[in-house]
């Protein structure tokens, strides 16, 4: 992302200044001001399914702090809409929590993100179910976080989330030898959470997202 206060945005401003001077403009200035900057370099999630196929998901980011030293291993759990009730009886300490939210019609991402932080999760991964996610199943969203930078969050597409949820359903089938309910792809997030919340997936995450307070 080339956001305000980032190295890329500063370099772009310098380039425009040089180009304007080069074409002969004379009243050209570079003015500085202070703001909270954000450097988002990457957020790559890797997952190997039960058949041995490796999936690589490119995620989007929000204005929060989260950095790994290359790929680091995590457990990933799915908790519906990420409400307080969805966490009942589930230990998410140090885990990645994936939720499906509708920021347009329900609530902003800051609420499930802070809930995940209070529960000790490593980060929240938001999937836009309807609302801002209606443009395409492969779309990544990144709005203003409207929350603290120490409660990290990422964005995952509906298409990629479906692969992870399918693997969680396969775990239910393997454990309970019952595929009828677990294969229902028309479940609401609440119904899916009730089925899938007891299981987790092993994933790897390589991410670098850094908020830079009061930069110029």
Functional labels for PLM-detected ranges:
Residues 11-19, 111, 115, 120, ...:
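Extracytoplasmic/secreted proteins, especially bacterial periplasmic and envelope-associated proteins
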Residues 1-96, 103, 182:
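Noncatalytic luminal/extracellular "stalk/propeptide" segments of secretory-pathway proteins
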Residues 43-46, 137-147:
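Short low-complexity, flexible loop/linker segments enriched in glycine and/or proline
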Residues 14, 37-41, 106-110, 132-139:
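Extracytoplasmic/secreted cell-surface and envelope-processing proteins
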Residues 30, 79, 99, 126, ...:
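General beta-strand structural signal in soluble alpha/beta enzymes
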Residues 1-5, 16, 21-27, 101, ...:
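Sec/Tat-exported extracytoplasmic proteins
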Residues 56-89, 143-216:
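Soluble metallo-hydrolase cores and metallopeptidase-like ectodomains found primarily
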Residues 84-91, 95-133:
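A conserved hydrophobic secondary-structure block that centers on an alpha-helix together
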